Amino acid sequence: MIEFKDICKHFQGTTALDHVSFTAESGQITALLGQNGAGKSTLMKILTGAYQKDSGEIRIDGRSVNITDPNAAEALGIGIVYQELSGMPHLTVSENIVIGRDPVRHGFLDFKKQREIARQMLNRLGASDIDVDQRLGELSVSQQQICEIAKCMAEEPKIV
């Protein structure tokens, strides 16, 4: 379970979040809906450590947490898939899915394991038709977004 209590965030005199509070229960899908500029992305960037909150509290499984940067969020098991694509179009699908966590065997990149991980993640998402050896930039935008989700899932987060 994740709880947001009275989260506030200001940018140069503009209030982005004004005492936002809500709870997302474990095992459930929670959607944030709102107009452009309502603060949805700001709240997610606070959760993932890209922004710091000005005030308020975030609790995960009843424990207050201080998410100071993206590494702290990752250590807490928080993963995110932004709507903007961030993949490397010149790399393969498998390289994109495991980038930063590349499997190594005997001191060398293990490309077989890399492909295996990518296939497993895509299969979990029902996207076994995506070729892990294809360059990401050759895929449709929707397929690239599926690869972004697979990359997040490969990190085995507790919270997505």
Predicted regions and their residues:
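Glycine-rich phosphate-binding loops of nucleotide-dependent enzymes
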Residues: M1-V160
